[in-house]
């Protein structure tokens, strides 16, 4: 009974969704108002076009939970994502304060785990987030992670491609292949001269490397309508610095 009561007390200390509900909830004062607004617009627009909900939460105190438990409990109790689809994700950040280490967790809902596996979540944390957090730039780290998660879910690149993303960007590889094809076609043209016949223009997508695009959301109007009842199973990854 004592253990049950204590566990219930812990859960009672978790924050409730704000009203009106928001996808960016900074209880630490770390992000500026403009940074919160920019992230919120992006996440609301993405939710509006895909129904996928990515919650960003910053807290100073984990209330006795591990960072993994805290993120999973928030995702489940707030109902991040849509019921039946379970297409939600929680990005939880406990900023570094004084001698206390900073902690971060990415927890995908059941329906997101095929796009953001535990290994991919760990890579996002180590590659996109912690380097910026160490420079006290929380906005860039969070924004980079959001962009990568959106791009993975939209199929802009696969998890394997993201894992190999430390090499050449995909668009540069495509450009290189096209250049080789153009040169090869000219030298195998059966003695045709290179003058006349017009000039073809080849359009190359200049999307840049992973995580740079994301979802703009500038054309979306209206606010966030609320969470949809998604479920979480405890997957994801954590990191600290």
Where are these regions (language model features)?
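Bacterial N-terminal signal peptides
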Residues: 1-9
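Folded, non-transmembrane soluble domains that reside on the lumenal/extracytoplasmic side of membranes
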Residues: 13-166
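Low-complexity, glycine/proline/serine-enriched intrinsically disordered segments
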Residues: 12-13, 113-114, 118-122, 126, ...
